[in-house]
Amino acid sequence: MAICGYGPVGSLCSLLMADYGYKVLLIDKNIGTSPTARAINTDGEQLRIFDKFGLAEKIIENSNQIEKIHFSKKSLEPIQSITQTLGDSSMGWPNQVLFYQPELEGFVREVVESKENIDVMELCELTDFNDKGNEVEIICKNKNKEIKFLSKFLIGCDGASSFVRKKLNIDLDDFGYNQK
């Protein structure tokens, strides 16, 4: 199993797949944790998954619970507001918590790196992939050298500018936010 993207989604996905017994290759074009916080929020449902790997309490201790969430367009015109109670939800975890992405990635990466059936290749940019029927040919560039892998599956967790999504012609609703 190959996973493109070593951010919060890709790293957690790799843990889940490894837990199901898959040998996982995790590739990312960058090295280290994200220097900026693009993901900032998680909820009780996701905390249940973090708990599976012993991370929920650590994330909660290093986060802040929030009562109100406001979604807006680039022009700051409101799209939706949600008010919820503070404290634990019916799932036993806080409804919403704000976290700092580089810190959260560090917590998850510690667990990823402890797994024998997860291999990580950073500075490895996915440049192409091809469906070969029962497997996927994965083509990457690492230090200007082309590398090819075969994998049963490829999961794209490579963010908003996802190469995987674009190659598969999967639409993205873009609200036009400047990520800088």
Please report, for each region that a protein language model flagged, where it lies by residue:
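Helix N-cap at the beta1-alpha1 junction of Rossmann-like dinucleotide-binding domains, i.e.
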Residues: 31-33
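Core beta-strand elements of the Rossmann-like FAD/NAD(P) dinucleotide-binding domain
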Residues: 144-153, 157
